A protein has these predicted regions:
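Short pre-catalytic strand/loop immediately N-terminal to key active-site residues, enriched for Gly-Thr
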Residues: 2-6, 176-191
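Conserved N-terminal subdomain of the carbohydrate kinase-like
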Residues: 13-103
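Short beta-strands and strand-loop turn motifs
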Residues: 64-69, 95-102, 126-136, 157, ...
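Conserved phosphate/ATP/ADP-binding segment of small-molecule kinases
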Residues: 109-177, 211
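Short, small-residue alpha-helix embedded
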Residues: 186-210, 214
Length: 222
C-alpha cells in the first residue's frame, strides 16, 4: 500500500491498527503519497525492482497467512505483487482492497478500464470493493457471476444502506452468499477503508469464518 504523510490512511494506519489487534505485520510500500484528509496532491510509485527487493528482504521472516493489497500505482504493480506472493507464499490468501479514487475525489488509476480491472480482480482471492469500485470493476456483471468466473470471493461493502443500517454482502465462487449488517455511521471518513480491510484480514489470518470477519470489520469502523 501507500505511505501517507498524515498516517491517517495507507500502510501506516494499517500496521498501527493490526498491531492493536495483536498481529505481527510486514509491509511493502507501493507508493509515497502527497495527501491529507481533504486533498490528494499526487504520488510517486515504487519501482518493480524495489518491490522485488522488498520481497527478497522478507524471506528470512515468518510467512504471512494473509496479504492485503491496498493502493497500487498501476495494475502491473498489482500483478507483480501477486506473482511474488504466489511464488514465495503459495498458501497465502491475497486480499485486494482496491483504491480507485480517493475520498477527496482523485482518480488513482485513470487509465484502467473495466476489462483490465476485471482481469486484475481475477488474480486475487478476495476483493473488497466499495460502492464506487463495484460499479467500476463489475461493469455489467453481477457479483454472483463475477465471483464464479474469476474464482474470487467478492465482499461488496455498503451494498444496501438505510438511515439506520448498512449491509455488506460476500459472494463466494461456489455460489454461497454471506450477509453482514451493522448500524449506519454516516459517510466514509478518510482511512476507514483501511480499518475495515485490515480487521477483515486479521480475523481471516487467525482462522475466523468470513461471516465473523465481516462483522468484526464493520464494528471496527462503526
Amino acid at each position: 500500500g501507500g505511505i501517507a504523510p498524515t498516517c491517517q490512511a495507507g500502510i501506516t494506519a494499517d500496521v498501527r491498527h493490526a498491531e492493536r489487534l495483536g498481529a505481527h505485520c510486514s509491509v511493502i510500500p507501493t507508493a509515497i503519497t502527497q495527501q491529507n484528509a481533504a486533498k490528494f496532491l499526487g504520488m510517486t510509485a515504487v519501482s518493480h525492482e524495489q518491490i522485488t527487493q522488498q520481497f527478497t528482504a522478507l524471506q528470512s521472516q515468518s510467512a504471512p497467512d494473509v496479504v492485503k493489497i491496498g493502493l497500487v500505482a498501476s495494475l502491473q504493480q498489482l500483478y507483480d505483487i501477486c506473482s511474488q506472493v504466489r511464488k514465495h507464499y503459495p498458501h497465502c490468501i491475497i486480499i485486494w482492497d482496491p483504491i480507485l479514487r480517493t475520498s477527496s475525489g482523485y482518480d488513482l488509476l485513470p487509465n484502467a478500464d473495466c476489462e483490465s480491472l476485471q482481469q486484475a480482480a481475477a488474480s486475487v482471492d478476495l476483493l473488497l470493493p466499495n460502492h464506487y469500485e463495484q460499479t467500476q470493476i463489475l461493469g455489467d456483471l453481477s457479483p454472483e457471476i463475477a465471483a464464479h468466473r474469476w474464482n474470487t470471493t467478492i465482499v461488496c461493502k455498503g451494498i444496501a444502506h438505510t438511515a439506520d443500517s448498512i449491509s455488506d454482502r460476500a459472494y463466494l465462487p461456489n455460489g454461497e452468499i454471506v450477509d453482514s449488517d451493522a448500524p449506519s455511521v454516516g459517510n466514509d471518513q478518510h482511512g476507514t477503508g483501511c480499518l475495515y480491510g485490515t480487521t477483515l484480514a486479521f480475523h481471516l489470518a487467525y482462522g475466523a469464518s468470513l461471516s465473523y470477519a465481516m462483522s468484526a470489520a464493520q464494528r471496527a469502523v462503526a
